[in-house]
Amino acid sequence: MAASSLEQKLSRLEAKLKQENREARRRIDLNLDISPQRPRPIIVITLSPAPAPSQRAALQLPLANDGGSRSPSSESSPQHPTPPTRPRHMLGLPSTLFTPRSMESIEIDQKLQEIMKQTGYLTIGGQRYQAEINDLENLGEMGSGTCGQVWKMRFRKTGHIIAVKQMRRSGNKEENKRILMDLDVVLKSHDCPYIVQCFGTFITNTDVFIAMELMGTCAEKLKKRMQGPIPERILGKMTVAIVKALYYLKEKHGVIHRDVKPSNILLDERGQIKLCDFGISGRLVDSKAKTRSAGCAAYMAPERIDPPDPTKPDYDIRADVWSLGISLVELATGQFPYKNCKTDFEVLTKVLQEEPPLLPGHMGFSGDFQSFVKDCLTKDHRKRPKYNKLLEHSFIKHYEILEVDVASWFKDVMAKTESPRTSGVLSQHHLPFFSTSVTWGAWPLAAQTPFQSGVIRCRGRVPSPRRATGGSGGQPCVCAGGPGPSFTEMGPSPSPMLSNTFFTPDPGACPGASTWGLPRRRLCQLLTTSTPGCC
């Protein structure tokens, strides 16, 4: 009976993951199938003022003495006999008139209004600039995912090169919650050096644009570029940064990330390591997460897969500690620890039934590193350490003070794994430009202007011939990374005044990408592709 109950839970969770993926694919296809010659109409929602008292319908108030009813204006209106009614018992009603769902909607609206006050400004290098989205010059697409696209842009007023994440606004409450959560966290985390920095936002009727610092690539793509493990010294510095970022989120903002994985860990040529993508982060109530968000099954903690009461999720930041442990094993060994899985169900079953993965003893890892990973992957979450305990671990203490030249290592890896620029070159004569009246996936290609030329390794979809108006069209290319802003510098800065740009497939792209470029998880080739957010 217990085994049957577990299978039912896993089946329900797998079904939820697939449903989320189908919805994500539907949204992407909807955006990409819109005719470019027909710009998306802007829908402006206005709240009408409350009707005057004279226009309001009379509110029937039950009388406690005789069971009848009268309207508020009954004293001044002609009296009419009313049919007899049976006496009514007055019931004590709760003082609030709002359901939890309506209160949640109100909270979303309030948060949006708060963020709207900050839109239209970029703060770069301590200087605040008033700006519009048209003040940004598009240098090319850097990547795309289930929640939008990421563009490399140049701020014309200063020449700064930044990353801009573009997400479409919709009537879907869950999508809007994800956008607002991402915005809320990055805007408030400006004082944490281990979280990707936000320069500002632009919000239109159709889109949300988040201007962020340009990072090099993510740990997931680095692993693919190297085609093997990442050195322990680099992972030591990475661990220090991510644990401190997660600790900051919990202590400063009461937030749990819920999507810790290699594709959400960013690095750059300066040696910086930062955490990104807070779309499915959750608020902690009494240090517990009270809401369920599927996230990526491959990195999900056992207590999230099989909670004591599935209707009342009740887990804490130690779920992210497990995800960090799985990520470290994957990056340190060069392969995902749960091997030969074909479905989410198989992964989830292995997480619950098998012993936690450990770092192999024959690969030369230090005892401190092995001990740290073992602590993170303690199956009983009640015995798994929290951040304050992890920060006292000898592995963290060692790499807090040890000097490691992450910048040189990063540059060396990026240089040695750069792809041939003559391989698989596709020509495309136009790049989309930003306008406050269009949305991602629906750019008016016929109206686009010539763009600067360069080599851009595409991690999203190259426009297909039926949607392009010039050049040789394109084809779907392999896609890596989830919806998180993997702000990847994919080649030299484009040179101005040339007529076209070449898109060349990236060597670190996922080999399991579907024909439409949707990201797949590494070892789980699902029939419906991966869970949104999985890579």
Curated annotation (Swiss-Prot):
Protein name: Dual specificity mitogen-activated protein kinase kinase 7
Top-level enzyme category: transferase
GO biological process, one term: positive regulation of telomere maintenance
Cofactor names: Mg(2+)
Protein origin, superkingdom: Eukaryota
Catalytic activities: L-seryl-[protein] + ATP = O-phospho-L-seryl-[protein] + ADP + H(+); L-threonyl-[protein] + ATP = O-phospho-L-threonyl-[protein] + ADP + H(+); L-tyrosyl-[protein] + ATP = O-phospho-L-tyrosyl-[protein] + ADP + H(+)
Site location (Cleavage): 60-61, 92-93
Active site (record annotation): 259
Disordered: annotated segments: 63-93
Subcellular location: Nucleus; Cytoplasm
Family annotation (SUPFAM superfamilies): Protein kinase-like (PK-like)
Species assigned in the record: Mus musculus
E.C. number: 2.7.12.2
Keyword annotations of the record: Acetylation, Apoptosis, ATP-binding, Coiled coil, Cytoplasm, Kinase, Magnesium, Metal-binding, Nucleotide-binding, Nucleus, Phosphoprotein, Serine/threonine-protein kinase, Stress response, Transferase, Tyrosine-protein kinase
UniProt GO cellular component terms: cytoplasm; nucleus
Residues bearing PTM Phosphoserine: 287, 427
Modified residues (Phosphothreonine): 291
Activity regulation statement: Activated by phosphorylation by specific MAP kinase kinase kinases such as MAP3K1/MEKK1, MAP3K3/MEKK3, MAP3K11/MLK3 and MAP3K12/DLK. Isoforms 3 and 4 have lower basal activity but a higher level of inducible activation, than isoforms 2, 6, 7 and 8.
Complex formation: Interacts with RASSF7, the interaction promotes phosphorylation. Interacts with VRK2. Interacts (via its D domain) with its substrates MAPK8/JNK1, MAPK9/JNK2 and MAPK10/JNK3. Interacts (via its DVD domain) with MAP3Ks activators like MAP3K5/ASK1 and MAP3K1/MEKK1. Interacts with SH3RF1, MAPK8IP1/JIP1, MAPK8IP2/JIP2 and MAPK8IP3/JIP3 scaffold proteins. Found in a complex with SH3RF1, RAC1, MAP3K11/MLK3, MAPK8IP1/JIP1 and MAPK8/JNK1. Found in a complex with SH3RF1, RAC2, MAP3K7/TAK1, MAPK8IP1/JIP1, MAPK8/JNK1 and MAPK9/JNK2.
Family recorded in the similarity comment: Belongs to the protein kinase superfamily. STE Ser/Thr protein kinase family. MAP kinase kinase subfamily.
Tissue: Expressed at high levels in brain, lung, liver, skeletal muscle, kidney, and testis and at lower levels in the heart and spleen.
